[in-house]
């Protein structure tokens, strides 16, 4: 920058600050500077202050200078203002050269700093102000947080805690992980990490104890961030646009009021169970998750909300809409369970009584469980509950027949302890497993007295829970959703005892008639439901699920196998955690001892060191359900697993037989479409049956539909008969003929299927009335460029693309002018993620693509050296190999040309860094060196010369030729251009006199030649056609020679015709002061 430019910069900046300096100094406005501007200011300051050192802190005054120097006075004013500025925004625009140091030493009072695109290694002076910053914004600059927080940018110092920083915004960066530098932000309240690439927060957010607002949206998180003590203050959590499948850990954020989980991967509403403990939650967003598409999404979500959220239902927002009270009531009518989600309470926390703990806790915390509802539940559960010989802690008074039960209690104490241990371990439905758990030969004795029915245990509902539906309602949902149903053998005896005991109770209470009617109705439903219970094939096994290849331990549960399903049943509440169909089971096996020893052991279990691990493979589409691994926790684990395998082996054998029959029908032979290699698919590797020995099921990655020769996945199944007659083969080829509705490729309008049939003749003019059998149609929008017929896509993958991993991106059917070729020819321009292809259209598009497409050119994308958008956006020039090769795409429609350019630039930006070049798109400008400059009129009143440019077709009888139409305020030109010529071709020589003198001689040489010209004053009228809306005729009349002439033109879209008429009409009507005559005819007459 010269001295004059530097002084001009100082004057302009000083003038701006003199006018608006008060709002800058008060902090109401932010001072925004480009980094080159700040560098020039620092250079000027250093000329008068000397070298600036990092040790200079505090307010600095300039040395005294003569007061008659205006530059020095402006400089001193600027220096004083910068030292008192409170808010600064630095914007860096990357240039071709290296970036020099960016010093912020003059800013001594900063409280708010924003960095956009600033290279942090060039930033100096942050160490002097970081301890006083209150707001920090850094975007498009960060690779790791420690670059800014620990090293203070280019200062490379060891920062102490940022004591004053309250808000930090690190969005739109390239962060892939967090680091320990976040612990320096001890006072932070607002943190924005959105639009990065973070996959796991680990524990780096646990030190932010004052954090109130956390935005970590649009990252790649798989787990909810761990907050630790910092979660106590968190009120707003935004996790939108991540990859969450589970909300485990969210229950720790008890004060959360705003939660955004939109656009994640939450599949079922049961994943929302942690929301049960978020009593302060008032806003929830689930839009875009798979569960959001459930027809009863709002009602299903309402059952997992905290009771306090139900109390505030009128103010609760779900997906931006107020949650109505009807949403809380709908789940009962729909059969949705209003039961609270399971909580991670340890086994053994259930109280000794079967009825559960004192309900006063639930009443005080939730405020929605009322005593009348409890009585209603008791009346429903009474018939269903087994006989338990102890008082219920939910009764106002113990109801016993013996007024002095002390002796009876001592007599029955051993049996009570045994039953209590069962209930403590297995929950309310402990009778379901009694036959498997009680000692042989010592069945539980029938107690002579009965206790009042009690409420369900707290472990099955959790605090603040709403009452469960009645058992008839629960069983009405079918055996798949009611695993608590007992088998007939186990439940027969308790039912008979219950009838007798209830009868005695009702005689004492005077309710025998009403209770008898209720019992009779419920017993009929019970007998009907028992017939639908699936028979158990073996005893339940106590197991611990292992998740993922690492074997992460889950919660202990029971594994039940029935005639049709395999259930994972919760220990305490006996709820079904997972239901898997046996018909989908493919393999069942025991992992070897070495693999089992490497698997983690659940803490607190007394299992043997050699506990077996059971692996089950299912044929589900969802990856999470394809493999189930269980650590067997039974005392006789090996015997129990063998018993289970004896049941599951016949099921897997049937699955293998069905798979073999299916492969026999397919004859098991494939052919690769890329290399022609024929091969048989590999047999599925199922554990011990594989040729390579045992292999863990979760490591299976083989796919039989991949060619072993070239790795391509484009394979077809060979026909059953190898001797197919030629007649059938021809019929098969004819069956590939496209349907009239097919749209194999997108191309600009008007080009149709007109081909360059003659070697030296130009392509025919566009005709929108004949598109051939491929029904080519223009893309209505940019996304249409990526749409391609499946037959053409297969042809590109097999015959054109040279790499097996090459992927199609977009294509455009367009005329192309290629350097070294005469004229232009129709091409299919295809862009992949590796190369750009030109496929010449050589024939009618009625046969397979190989018969009418010929590969002409393949250019690696990293070799592109120039992209230029032509005049009016009607052409696109591509250069490669430093200009050694070039071509011009001629869509002649600005919309399609710009759409293709945007797609091409997106593909170039997505290339790997090693392949990415620095090519950027430019736009052709008309300068004095331009080929059209001598034809334009110079207007002294305007800076730029006015003209209208259009690539069109000149209709000459039944044929057409390519021309360019150039309009100036006084003249109309028809030009012949060499589209593939160099952009720096010599322009037509300028001469005085008539324009005809400027016409260069024909033949090789200039890139443009004036074919014909007419003064605007000779234009008499314009002729349009209803049947051909892209055609027009300009009629001329020369008053001197009294001759009439016309130009019959054709454009590619009606928008161009409208713009052409609008540009002509204004100067013509200004010249004659009357309206331009426009005549519309019905049909196009080619003979005139």
Swiss-Prot record:
Record PTM Phosphoserine, positions in chain: 387, 389, 392, 470, 599, 761, 773, 777
Keyword Repeat appears in the UniProt entry: yes
GO molecular function: protein kinase binding
PROSITE patterns: LRR
Record's GO cellular component terms: azurophil granule lumen; cytoplasm; extracellular region; intracellular membrane-bounded organelle; lysosomal membrane
One biological process term in Gene Ontology: protein localization
Basic and acidic residues bias spans: 750-759
Cellular localisation: Cytoplasm
Comp. bias intervals (Acidic residues): 508-529
LRR repeat residues: 109-130, 132-152, 164-185, 187-209, 210-231, 233-254, 255-276, 280-301
Extent of Basic residues compositional bias: 375-385
UniProt keyword annotations, A-Z: Cytoplasm, Leucine-rich repeat, Phosphoprotein, Repeat
Compositional bias per record (Low complexity), positions renumbered to this chain: 346-367, 447-460, 978-994
Gene3D superfamilies: Ribonuclease Inhibitor (3.80.10.10)
Major subcellular location class: cytoplasm
Amino acid composition bias (Polar residues), ranges on this chain: 733-742
Segments of this protein annotated with the region Disordered: 335-407, 437-533, 724-780, 978-1009
Record-linked InterPro entries: Leu-rich_rpt, LIP1_N, LRR_dom_sf
Subunit structure: Found in a ternary complex composed of STK11/LKB1, STK11IP and SMAD4. Interacts with STK11/LKB1 and SMAD4.
Biological role stated in the UniProt entry: May regulate STK11/LKB1 function by controlling its subcellular localization.
Family: Belongs to the STK11IP family.
Protein name: Serine/threonine-protein kinase 11-interacting protein
């Amino acid at each position: 920058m010269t001295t004059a430019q530097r002084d001009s910069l100082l004057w302009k900046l000083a003038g701006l600050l003199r006018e608006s300096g008060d709002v800058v100094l008060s902090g109401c406005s932010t001072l925004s500077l480009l980094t080159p501007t700040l560098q020039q200011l620092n250079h000027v300051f250093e000329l008068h202050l000397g070298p600036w050192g990092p040790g200079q802190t505090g307010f600095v005054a300039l040395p005294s200078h003569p007061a008659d120097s205006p530059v020095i006075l402006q400089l001193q004013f600027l220096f004083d203002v910068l030292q008192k500025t409170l808010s600064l925004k630095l914007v860096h625009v990357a240039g071709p050269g290296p970036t020099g140091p960016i010093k912020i030493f003059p800013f001594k009072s900063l409280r708010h700093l924003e960095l956009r695109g600033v290279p942090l290694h060039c930033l100096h002076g942050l160490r002097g102000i970081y301890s006083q910053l209150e707001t920090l914004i850094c975007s498009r600059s960060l690779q790791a947080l420690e670059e800014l927080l620990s090293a203070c940018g280019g200062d490379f110092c060891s920062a102490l805690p940022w004591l004053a920083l309250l808000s930090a915004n690190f969005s739109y960066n390239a962060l892939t992980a967090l680091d320990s530098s976040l612990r320096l932000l001890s006072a932070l309240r607002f943190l924005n990490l959105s639009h990065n690439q973070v996959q796991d927060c680990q524990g780096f957010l646990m030190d932010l104890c004052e954090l109130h607002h956390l935005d970590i949206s649009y990252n790649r998180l798989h787990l909810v961030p761990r907050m630790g003590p910092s979660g106590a203050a968190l009120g707003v959590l935004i996790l939108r646009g991540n990859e969450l499948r589970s909300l485990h850990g969210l229950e720790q954020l008890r004060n959360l009021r705003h939660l955004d989980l939109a656009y994640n991967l939450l599949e079922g509403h049961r994943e929302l169970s942690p929301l049960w403990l978020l009593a302060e939650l008032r806003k929830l967003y689930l839009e875009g998750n798979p569960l959001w598409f459930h027809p009863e999404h709002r009602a299903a979500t309402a059952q997992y909300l905290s009771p306090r959220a139900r109390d505030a239902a009128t103010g609760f927002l779900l997906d931006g809409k107020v949650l109505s009270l009807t949403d809380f009531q709908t789940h009962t009518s729909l059969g949705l369970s209003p039961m609270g989600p399971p909580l991670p309470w340890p086994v053994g926390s259930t109280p000794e009584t079967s009825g559960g703990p004192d309900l006063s806790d639930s009443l005080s915390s939730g405020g929605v469980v009322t005593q009348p509802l409890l009585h209603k539940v008791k009346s429903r559960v009474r018939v269903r509950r087994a006989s338990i010989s102890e008082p219920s802690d939910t009764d106002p008074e113990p109801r016993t027949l013996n007024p002095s039960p002390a002796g009876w209690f001592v007599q029955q104490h051993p049996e009570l302890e045994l039953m209590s241990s069962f209930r403590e371990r297995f929950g309310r439905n402990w009778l379901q497993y009694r036959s498997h758990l009680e000692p042989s030969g010592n069945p539980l004795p029938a107690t002579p007295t009965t206790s009042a029915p009690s409420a369900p245990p707290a472990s099955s509902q959790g605090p603040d829970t709403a009452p469960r539906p009645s058992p008839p309602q629960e069983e009405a949902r079918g055996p798949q959703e009611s695993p608590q149903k007992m088998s007939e053998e186990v439940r027969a005896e308790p039912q008979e005892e219950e009838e007798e005991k209830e009868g005695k109770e009702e005689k004492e209470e005077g309710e025998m008639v009403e209770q008898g009617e209720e019992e009779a109705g419920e017993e009929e439903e019970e007998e009907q439901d028992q017939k639908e219970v699936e028979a158990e094939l073996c005893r339940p096994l106590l197991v611990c699920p292992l998740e993922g290849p690492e074997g992460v331990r889950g919660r202990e549960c029971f594994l039940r196998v029935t005639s049709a399903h395999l259930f994972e049943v919760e220990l305490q509440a006996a709820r079904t955690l997972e239901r898997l169909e046996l018909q989908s089971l493919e393999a069942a096996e025991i992992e070897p001892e070495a693999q089992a020893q490497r698997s983690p052991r659940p803490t607190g279990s007394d299992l043997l060191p050699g506990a077996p691990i059971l692996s089950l493979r299912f044929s589900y589409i969802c990856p999470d359900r394809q493999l189930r691994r269980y650590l067997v926790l039974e005392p006789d684990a090996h015997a129990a697993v063998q018993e289970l395998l004896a049941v599951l082996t016949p099921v897997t054998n049937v699955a293998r037989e069905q798979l073999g029959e299916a492969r026999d029908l397919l004859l098991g032979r494939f052919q690769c479409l890329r290399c022609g290699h024929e091969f048989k698919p590999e047999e599925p590797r199922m554990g011990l049956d594989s040729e390579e020995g045992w292999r863990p099921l979760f490591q299976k990655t083989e796919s039989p539909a991949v060619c072993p020769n070239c790795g391509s996945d484009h394979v077809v199944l060979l026909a059953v008969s190898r001797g197919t007659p030629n007649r059938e083969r021809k019929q098969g080829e004819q069956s590939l003929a496209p349907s009239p509705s097919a749209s194999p490729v997108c191309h600009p309008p008007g080009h149709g299927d007109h081909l360059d049939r003659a070697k030296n003749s130009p392509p025919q003019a566009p005709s929108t009335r004949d598109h051939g059998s491929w029904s080519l149609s223009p893309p209505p929008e940019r996304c249409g460029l990526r749409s391609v017929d499946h037959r053409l896509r297969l042809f590109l993958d097999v015959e054109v693309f040279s790499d097996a991993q090459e992927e199609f991106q977009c294509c455009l059917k367009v005329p192309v002018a290629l350097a070294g070729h005469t004229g232009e020819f129709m091409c299919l321009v295809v862009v992949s993620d590796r190369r750009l292809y030109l496929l010449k259209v050589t024939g009618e598009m009625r046969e397979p693509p190989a018969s009418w497409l010929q590969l002409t050119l393949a250019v690696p994308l990293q070799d592109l050296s120039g992209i230029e958008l032509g005049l009016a956006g009607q052409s696109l020039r591509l250069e490669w190999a430093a200009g050694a090769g070039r071509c011009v795409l001629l869509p002649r429609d600005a919309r399609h040309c710009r759409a293709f350019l945007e797609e091409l630039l997106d593909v170039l930006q997505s290339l790997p860094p090693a392949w990415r070049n620095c090519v950027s798109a430019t736009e052709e400008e008309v300068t004095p060196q331009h080929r059209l400059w001598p034809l334009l009129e110079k207007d002294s009143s305007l800076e730029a010369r006015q003209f209208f440019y259009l690539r069109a077709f000149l209709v000459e009888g039944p044929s057409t030729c390519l021309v360019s139409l150039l309009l100036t305020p006084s003249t109309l030109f028809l030009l012949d251009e060499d589209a593939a010529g160099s952009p720096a071709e010599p322009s037509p020589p300028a001469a005085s006199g008539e324009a005809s003198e400027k016409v260069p001689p024909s033949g090789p040489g200039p890139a443009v030649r004036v074919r014909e010209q007419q003064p605007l004053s000779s234009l008499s009228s314009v002729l349009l056609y209803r049947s051909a809306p892209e055609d027009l005729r300009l009629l001329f009349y020369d008053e001197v020679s009294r001759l009439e002439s016309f130009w019959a033109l054709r454009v590619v879209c009606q928008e161009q015709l409208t713009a052409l008429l609008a540009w002509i009409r204004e100067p013509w009507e200004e010249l004659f002061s009357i309206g331009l005559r426009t005549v519309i005819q019905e049909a196009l007459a080619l003979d005139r």
